[in-house]
Amino acid sequence: MFLRLIQRTLELGRRALVLVPEISLTPQMIRRLKSTFGSRLAVQHSALNNTERLLQWRMIQQGNADIVVGTRSAVFAPLQNLGLIIMDEEQEHTYQSESAPRFDAHDVAKKRAVMENALLLFASATPLTETYHAAESGKLQLVQLTHRYGGRPLPSVDFIDMRAELAAGNPREVSVRLARELQENLDNGEQSILLLNRRGYRTIGMCTTCGHVLKCPNCSVPLVYHKPQQALLCHHCGHTVHPLPQTCPECGGKISYSGFGTQRVEEELAELLPGARILELAELLPGARILRMDQDSTSRKDAHETMLAQFARHEYDILLGTQMVAKGLDFEKVTLVGVLGIDSLLFGQGFRAYESVFSLITQVVGRGGRAALPGRALIQTTVPDHPVLQLAAAQDYKGFYREEITFRRFSLYPPFCSFVVVGFIGDQEGAVFIAAQRFGALLGQHAAQKPNIPLRILGPAPMNITMLNNKFRYKLTLKCRNDAAFRALLHETLDAYDAEKLPQKASVILDFNSDGDL
């Protein structure tokens, strides 16, 4: 469908912009487009160095590119005569920038489409609830593909109850059945994908005597054990503790490391990347060639493209990774998908938690059985009867949407209101809290003079990560109608806050289309 739309756009003498949520998806997309449309194609994403980015930008600016492919920043590419914008996997949160300049690629794409009279396509098997609601309401045109590409059946999905595994004496993170089916795939010369959305080896270090948890001194989060470095690492600020602590800094008791991440599961499966062998589970999968793909293993330039090409050439049997392995990848020999550790996401914070889990499972399950061989998926969980997991296993998006839209309507969440977070960041926790409190009071006072503006002010409250990079963080959550009148109200309040003579102020950050945190 994408190729036909792009072909028609080029025939009309116009140009096309294709957005993808992850850098890892650009190589496959580029190969497909170049094989069909030739080399007049430019790329925009953060993995390019400054020289490469400038050359690609000039190529676009000078009119030498008919198609641009890239991640969210590509939405600003200076394409002239733009006729088509495709946002693939539009449900992904990576389309929203979390650092300055803050923007949502959805909003920028909509604005460009209107300004340039271009067609905008939001593509997804699991659209955002707001997007599908807009289509149901007639604000967007809904086009549904009722058959899987190539006419292949959907993979079969089974659940593995990890409570039963533990009761049966299996302490491993990989269940007996998953290990058995991985071995069957190895014997049959087929490939497997395993999803585990946690990096590192062990996810928490805790004292067995007093219960003290080893946390980052700069951020209010536990440090994560990374075995190759024999160190604890903060995934937010990069703080490192080396050598690995064995005794509690509070009471001198023994530190125990628990939980599991991709490094731990990789060790349980067989070998590390080429040149480093892991023996922990050689008895389970002797001879297995395992490729780990997460933020740690893909930090090198071109690592995504190199690793995916290696997997496509069947240099590896198992692709193990975080959520980057769930999206848009297409390997004909992948017949088994395993999902591990999904419960931590299922019970995560934010009103989009269920939506994220449903999308993630649906996407990763769809990576299997995409060619001649049928696919199957195994989901490890302690709550196999959870309705979100059951709906995801059945690939029942409409069923999930009905449940989700009912919850959103009852609880007044988007699309039935706009969700805006006003963040406050500073050096002194007390001062940050007072700043948030004062801003909320000012906003309430100004809003009281404009009763026609619907507004609910929640907070102040600490953010999910209260301290980040030695800065304390609090928030106000606003349920509102994000129109010109509301934005004018915010500007008035910001001006009034700026005029206040508080002893210590905090930086203020506005985050529109938020899921409830920064």
Question: Language-model features: where?
Answer:
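Inter-lobe coupling/hinge segments of SF2-like helicase ATPases
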Residues: M1-F433, Q445, M463-T466, K475-L476, ...
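Solvent-exposed amphipathic alpha-helical surface segments
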Residues: T36, H446, K450, Y497-E500
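Short beta-strand elements
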Residues: L291, H446-M463, Q504-N513
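Short amphipathic alpha-helix segments
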Residues: K398, F433-L458
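Short amphipathic alpha-helices in soluble, non-transmembrane regions
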Residues: A435-A441, A488-A496
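C-terminal effector/interaction modules appended to NTPase cores
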Residues: N469-K471
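Short, loop-centered acidic/histidine patches that primarily coordinate divalent metals
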Residues: T477-R481, N513
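Generic C-terminus detector
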Residues: H491, D495-L518
